[in-house]
Amino acid sequence: MANWTQEDGAPTPVTNPSEVSQVSGGSVTGGPAVTSCLIPSFAEAVKLLKARYSCLVLDTHRRHISLPPVHLKKKKTGIQEQLNAELLKYSNSLDGVPVAYDNIKVVGQHGNIYDDQGFIHFNIEASFVIFRPKNGSRLMGVINKMGASHVGCLVHGCFNASVMKPNALTSDQWRDSGLCVGQSLEFEVFQLDADAAGVLLIRGRLDRSRVQELVAQFEQKQVTAESSTEADATEDTTDSPKPKKKKKRKKDKNDTESSMEECVNNSSLQETSEHHQTTTEEDCSANGRHKEKKKKKKRDKNDTESSMDECMNNNSLQETALDTTEEDCNANERHKEKKKKKKRDKQQDSAEIVPTSDSSGYISDKTSRKRALEAGDDTETPAAKKKKKSK
């Protein structure tokens, strides 16, 4: 197993990881597909180690490999295929994302076969360039996409990162911030994540100093724009162009003619307005007189009707008063007659009960009448006596 000689007809081993897409184009069964992203070579990755804000680390790592039986005669090719499939994918054992590898060594002379499995198990050791960003670390990327809320960047040509828009900037300011596609951008990492396939997701934000610079730039632009508008307004008001003398004369003539026409028009308008006022005043006075006459007629009619109503009311009141007085008089006379009848009846009874007589025993009507008259009231009227005589 430690023999690295290749048999006749066997493919040559891959020395550059960038050639993986050409050599292992999915011919190996059971192996994962190779990513389409551009993978840097080991030499290029080593050069990037010295770059600022690269977050790349060179580390020698030992790991376990299980080769299928198809790679018994081409062991190195099988190892390279497995390692190439793990590039640019997050690895827990490496605590990062492997970018490139080199210097593969087999630990031990022989491999092992466990039980009835067909895979050959052995350990290898290699040098890996690992991408290990942390929260708070800074990265340099190249802008490849401009959005309303973020900017897409490509770090080391193979890692996607999205830089979010600062809250201090509006969408218009973010659009006019001067960022464009192809420009390098420095940002700070604040979130790292990996999906089920192991693809690393990076979220970043601009540095505070850069945000302050952008805000200051926009404020300065706004101030300059306001000052320029004010200056333009003052120039328009103060620095008016001086016309020529000929134009002035023409303008003066036109002004005098227009003023004369205006005076004539104003005088005609005044005359027409005065005439209209006089006519309107006459019409108003005539209408007022006619209305006053109508009002007088209405007043006279109302006065006559009211006087007639008063007379009628007075007559009715007098009639009712007379009726009431007559009824009262009749009632009083009847009451008096009743009283007189009662008195007469009493007198007649007393005359019948107590007859007067002489010493000789003769009874005369005169004495009884006199006594009756003396005993009666003095209030009797002579009319009553006449009535008795008539009876």
From Swiss-Prot:
<dbReference type="InterPro" id="IPR036898">
    <property type="entry name" value="RNA_pol_Rpb7-like_N_sf"/>
</dbReference>
<comment type="subunit">
    <text>Component of the RNA polymerase I (Pol I) complex consisting of at least 13 subunits.</text>
</comment>
<comment type="function">
    <text>DNA-dependent RNA polymerase catalyzes the transcription of DNA into RNA using the four ribonucleoside triphosphates as substrates. Component of RNA polymerase I which synthesizes ribosomal RNA precursors. May be involved in recruitment of Pol I to rDNA promoters.</text>
</comment>
<feature type="coiled-coil region">
    <location>
        <begin position="289"/>
        <end position="353"/>
    </location>
</feature>
<keyword id="KW-0539">Nucleus</keyword>
<keyword id="KW-0804">Transcription</keyword>
<dbReference type="InterPro" id="IPR005576">
    <property type="entry name" value="Rpb7-like_N"/>
</dbReference>
<feature type="region of interest" description="Disordered">
    <location>
        <begin position="1"/>
        <end position="27"/>
    </location>
</feature>
<feature type="region of interest" description="Disordered">
    <location>
        <begin position="220"/>
        <end position="391"/>
    </location>
</feature>
<feature type="compositionally biased region" description="Basic residues">
    <location>
        <begin position="288"/>
        <end position="299"/>
    </location>
</feature>
<dbReference type="GO" id="GO:0006352">
    <property type="term" value="P:DNA-templated transcription initiation"/>
</dbReference>
<protein>
    <recommendedName>
        <fullName>DNA-directed RNA polymerase I subunit RPA43</fullName>
    </recommendedName>
</protein>
<keyword id="KW-0240">DNA-directed RNA polymerase</keyword>
<dbReference type="InterPro" id="IPR045113">
    <property type="entry name" value="Rpb7-like"/>
</dbReference>
<comment type="similarity">
    <text>Belongs to the eukaryotic RPA43 RNA polymerase subunit family.</text>
</comment>
<dbReference type="InterPro" id="IPR041178">
    <property type="entry name" value="RPA43_OB"/>
</dbReference>
<keyword id="KW-0175">Coiled coil</keyword>
<dbReference type="GO" id="GO:0005736">
    <property type="term" value="C:RNA polymerase I complex"/>
</dbReference>
<dbReference type="Pfam" id="PF03876">
    <property type="entry name" value="SHS2_Rpb7-N"/>
</dbReference>
<dbReference type="Pfam" id="PF17875">
    <property type="entry name" value="RPA43_OB"/>
</dbReference>
<keyword id="KW-0597">Phosphoprotein</keyword>
<dbReference type="InterPro" id="IPR041901">
    <property type="entry name" value="RNAP_I_Rpa43_N"/>
</dbReference>
<feature type="compositionally biased region" description="Basic residues">
    <location>
        <begin position="336"/>
        <end position="345"/>
    </location>
</feature>
<dbReference type="GO" id="GO:0006362">
    <property type="term" value="P:transcription elongation by RNA polymerase I"/>
</dbReference>
<feature type="compositionally biased region" description="Polar residues">
    <location>
        <begin position="312"/>
        <end position="323"/>
    </location>
</feature>
